[in-house]
Amino acid sequence: MSAAVRGADARSFLLPPLLAQASRDAIALRHGAVEIDQAAFLSRAGAIAEALRSAGIGEGDVVALAASRTPDTIAAVVACIACGAAPLPLDPALPSSRLAAMAAIAGARVVVGDGIALPPSLPRVVVDADAHAALHGGAGPLAYVLFTSGSTGEPKGVAMRSDAFGELVGWHLAHPRLGRAAVTLQFAPLGFDVSFQELFSTLGAGGTLVLVDEAQRRDPYALLELIAREGVQRLFLPCVALQALAEAVAAGGAFPHALRDVVTAGEALHATPAVRALFAELPGAVLHNHYGPTESHVVSAHELAGDPATWPDLPPIGRALPHARLRVVAADADDATSAGADVGEGHLLIGGACLAAGYIGRPALTAERFVERDGARWYRSGDRVRIEPDGTLHYLGGLDDQLKIDGIRVEPGEIEAALCRHADVAQAVVVGVDGPAGRTLAAHIVPRDPHLGEAALASALRTHCAATLAPWLVPRTFAIHAALPLAASGKIDRRALARDADQALHWREGAPLAEQWLDLWRQLLDAPQLGADDNLFDHGARSLLVVRALTELRRHGHVLSVVQAYEYPSVAAQVALLEGGAVRDEGRREAERGVAQRAAFARFAPRAGGAR
């Protein structure tokens, strides 16, 4: 599209392109050995839509979906759109109280799907497994409702307008590369906006969506095998997942021979040596860097092609898409001042046809973040950017991420890029830590080789930084991790790194490993009665705590991966694995019982284990 379509016309990019594929024999979905062609997929969506209509669902309603990774769930998303309703994907692994709160805030009228703990008062729509019907209808006012990540406070649901999302899908379908029919991996959890981008841009172009299991999603080697076996041509990945895949390829994982487009979003893109090496072996492939919060979805894009050696370490997030307006204002400004040719930096405001309706059921918060200025509506992104004369934007981090050390402003991304240039570094995150000496810089590192000595690596990195960075940019401390903690969105949890840096752990030197490991977990979970055979996730284990435990374990000469920690979620099973013995049957049963907890993890663990 050369310009934003605007208004109700943009909704035509949602359902009609899918319906246009009905007569084709092409495969719409693949999930393991199951293949579903376009016609069968649409008729299944039609049956679900008819069941929803029979339950009284119509335009403007909200439908809760159990967000499992199955063809029927994908069909249910399309069915909701056809009814004019908004799907509300809910992760069955979340606590029942949180699920109930989300459904209540969104005003969900019914729920579709099994295995989700919602109040009995919410009617369930059951669709016969063999039911099929012609799909008809069209999008209503909302395309979807998604609750943003966060473990405290009242849930915050973004209500995305159908015409706004339709603008993005229309841009995709008209794109010379992204608009082609492609075999696309459905990587993002359905509770995140990128999943809708994957779904509608793929099926609307006549492509094939390949569904991935959670175990494959968390394991980069298994994921590479799937990508190679299925001939996946397009990926949507957060930066941390792309890095993990690139590392796995370098370590001998299956090569993604058919890959031609990778779309990354969710956090600042680093063109690391591993990522460059991957694309150097994929001639003609393009790396697309997208930016956009859930409240607007994607609003800018930049393409990296050609020789990866020429790519900048921190690629820009690009220029505004046709349906978005972007302005840069002073970080403390109350008004939206047009960026124009200003080559400065500041707070990014987002406007245009891309904006969500707001936060469902929370008018005060909507008014706070979506503001009226100069006769237009703007979303206060909370992100800092730098703008070039041609409108190209560079992401500098969140307003809350800006650091000052001894009065000097510090950009963590610059330090992280320097660290990632070191041959032994797979990932790096730099955060500010407040202490007796004031605020200092702490570098958190995931090494390429998990067996590297921590002290030697920290010393080498300090020397490396001193040789390449200004003195005030050299981190004071270097922490070596098995993996970095991730939020549910797949982004690195920087706040968790800074918040938990001061928690001291006591390791019982000289004690048997089983006692040391159990004692460490009792400290982390504040659970003195924790038993060796107890499921750690039943006692509050979470992503950050797993990473901290494995990092401490590594300091004392033992290596356990994040994936193994989730596969064997008891101290006894993990110790058996570490000591090279057989894992007892009850440990394996615990591993099976831990599937629900691991689904909640829903992370892509880097090696050792949506739009921004």
What are these regions (language model features)?
Residues 1, 5, 81, 142, ...:
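Regions immediately C-terminal to embedded phosphopantetheine-bearing carrier domains
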Residues 1-4, 12-15, 111-135, 165, ...:
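AMP-dependent adenylate-forming
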Residues 1-110, 114-123, 128-145, 160, ...:
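AMP-binding/adenylate-forming domain of the ANL superfamily
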Residues 26-27, 31-35, 55-62, 396-399, ...:
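Phosphopantetheine carrier-protein modules
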Residues 67-70, 91, 178, 188-192, ...:
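Conserved AMP-binding
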Residues 131-147, 154, 178-184, 190:
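Conserved pre-ATP/AMP-binding loop-to-beta segment of ANL
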Residues 156-185, 193-233:
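Conserved AMP-binding/adenylation subdomain of ANL enzymes
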Residues 204-207, 232-234, 246-316, 325, ...:
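Gly/Ser/Thr-rich phosphate-binding loop
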